[in-house]
């Protein structure tokens, strides 16, 4: 049980790891990695598509960023190559799952690897949820700051990455709400005429 306690303490670290993208954009009280994964898991829970395994989607959402309790949230702006990022996270996952009994160790590590390699329909869907959760959060920060459009780069970065019908439906609702806020102008700190909404 000592190892299980250490595992749970590592999981708890995710509550204290801020999402780097928000830190770099000077967001006050940025969300943690744990915050992000919780809403992703709730998104997975609400998926109604019977062609995918909902339980597996939830598990993938819960473990996909687990390595960040050790390596931190490595953002594109950190200029770390994909190969190096994967190496660091793989080493972290070997350590983290090594605290668990063999069955759990294999299950959690294999879930992480499945997400990393995008080797299943569930992993591909959860990747879409990952991107969608990010831009929902970006929209919420724009609302909280009263600066519609300030975090446009996050929306641009997801263009062409959404395909699942349920994800597209939620994206449509998000785009419509955000368009209204941009039209209203907020504090007009951004040239909203040049903005585009997130694209499928």
Curated annotation (Swiss-Prot):
Residues 33-135 form the HD domain. The keyword Ligase does not apply. Its cofactor is Mn(2+); Co(2+); Mg(2+). SMART domains: HDc (SM00471). Signal peptide: none annotated. It comes from the Eukaryota. It holds the Pfam family HD_3. A divalent metal cation 2 binds at residues 68, 73-74. Its EC number is 3.1.3.89. InterPro entries: HD/PDEase_dom, HD_domain, YfbR/HDDC2. It is an enzyme of class 3 (hydrolase). The keyword Signal does not apply. It catalyses: a 2'-deoxyribonucleoside 5'-phosphate + H2O = a 2'-deoxyribonucleoside + phosphate. A divalent metal cation 1 binds at residues 36, 64-65, 130. GO terms for molecular function: 5'-deoxynucleotidase activity; metal ion binding. Binds 2 divalent metal cations. Shows activity with Mn(2+), Co(2+) and Mg(2+) but shows no activity with Zn(2+). Keywords: Cobalt, Hydrolase, Magnesium, Manganese, Metal-binding. Catalyzes the dephosphorylation of the nucleoside 5'-monophosphates deoxyadenosine monophosphate (dAMP), deoxycytidine monophosphate (dCMP), deoxyguanosine monophosphate (dGMP) and deoxythymidine monophosphate (dTMP). Belongs to the HDDC2 family. Homodimer. This is 5'-deoxynucleotidase HDDC2. It comes from Danio rerio. The lineage of its organism: Eukaryota, Metazoa, Chordata, Craniata, Vertebrata. The gene is hddc2.
């Amino acid at each position: 049980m000592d190892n299980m306690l250490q595992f749970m303490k590592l999981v708890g670290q995710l509550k204290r790891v801020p999402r780097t993208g928000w830190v770099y954009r000077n967001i006050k009280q940025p969300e943690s990695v744990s915050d992000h994964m919780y809403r992703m898991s709730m998104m997975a829970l609400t998926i109604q598509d019977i062609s995918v395994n909902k339980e597996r989607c939830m598990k993938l959402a819960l473990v996909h960023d687990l390595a960040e309790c050790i390596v931190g949230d490595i953002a594109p702006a950190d200029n770390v190559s994909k190969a190096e990022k994967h190496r660091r996270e793989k080493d972290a996952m070997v350590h983290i799952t090594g605290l668990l009994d063999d069955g759990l160790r294999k299950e959690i590590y294999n879930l992480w690897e499945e997400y990393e390699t995008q080797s299943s329909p569930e992993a591909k869907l959860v990747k879409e949820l990952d991107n969608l959760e990010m831009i929902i959060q970006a929209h919420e920060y724009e609302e909280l700051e009263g600066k519609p459009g300030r975090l446009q780069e996050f929306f641009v970065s997801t263009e062409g990455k959404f395909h699942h019908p349920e994800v597209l439906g939620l994206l449509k609702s998000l785009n419509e709400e955000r368009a209204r806020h941009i039209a209203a102008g907020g504090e007009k700190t951004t040239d909203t005429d040049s903005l585009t909404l997130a694209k499928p």
